[in-house]
Amino acid sequence: MPADPTTALPLRASYEAVKTGRPFDEDVLLSVVFGSHTPCPDDQRCLHIDLAPLAGAACIEVWRGIGPVRVGTAGQVRYAEDGAHCAGWLSIEEEAVGNLADATQAAYRSLLRFQAESPYRHVWRMWNYVADINAGEGDEERYRQFCLGRARAFAAEMADAQAIGYPAASAVGKRGSARTLEVCWIASRSPGITVENPRQVSAFEYPREYGPASPTFSRATVTSDRLLLVSGTASIVGHISMHAGNLAAQIEETFRNIDALVERSTAERLIKPTPLDQHSTVKAYLRDASDAASVTQELRRRLGPSVPVLLLAADICRSDLLIEIEVAHQG
C-alpha cells in the first residue's frame, strides 16, 4: 500500500549508475534512462529517452518518493504513486493524430484529465521531449506548434491554469528519432508555489512574435517540501535571446537567471538560503556535443565537485540558444 502522506519524506532526485538486472527500490517513482544504447531495466517506472549523455558513465535520473509505490495504467497514462506524490508519463505518435500540435493537445488533455480525476491534482514539474524541435519556419516551427497544442489543452481542461500557476517545465529536442512526443511529470496532493524571474517576461506572457500561443509554463515551482524545481533556463533577458553564438556568455546569462530564481525564492521564504550541494541536481542540455568538455569544466568551476551534474545532447527550443539548464534544489 502507498505510504502515509502525513509522514512523507521530501521528494528527491538523484543521478545513479545503471544497474541492469536489479529491480528498482520500492520508493522509486520515476527513472529516466538517457541514450539509445543505454539499457533500460525491465520496470514500468523506467522511461527511455533518446538523448545522448555527453560526459561520464551512463546513468539514470531517479525520482524518489516515500515508498512503497504502486504502479498503474489509465488510458495512455502510466503512473506510479506513493500516497503523497505521483509520477506520470505517456507517449504519442504524431502520425496517429495528424501533426505535432494535435499530438501535443491530445497528450496534454489526457494527462490533465488524469490529474484532475486523481488525488494528486497539483502538477509540480513537467518534461517534454520533442523530435526535431527546431524544424519548420515561422509559426510552423515545431516548437511553436508544440506550444500551440499545449496551450489549447490547458484552455480546454484547466482554464484557470494561469491563475493557479502553470507547472515548471522543460521542452527539448530529440534528434534522429521517430516523431513520438514523450511527456513525463511529477504531481502531488499538495500545491506548489510558482516563481517567476524578475529578469524575464513570464513565458506565458510572451509577445506574438514567438508564435501563435505563448509557452505555458512557470519559471520554477517550490514544492510543499521546499524543493525548488527550476524549469529549463537559458540565456534570455526579458523575452529576448542573448549572446547569439557565444556559449560562454550564454552560460553566464543562464546562471544569472537561475540565481535570480533562487534569490526570489529565498526572499519570499519559500526555501532556506542554502547553496547547491550534493543533494541538488543540475541537468544541462547542450546543442553542440563537441562543447561537452569545456561546458563540464565550466559547470564544475561554478558548482564545485559535489553537485551532481548530467550533460545531455539536445536541441534547445530556440535555434539561437546553445545551452539550457535545469535545477532541483532542496532549500
Regions found by a protein language model. Give the residues of each.
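N-terminal presequence-like segments and the immediate start of the first folded domain
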Residues: 1-256, 260-280, 285-331
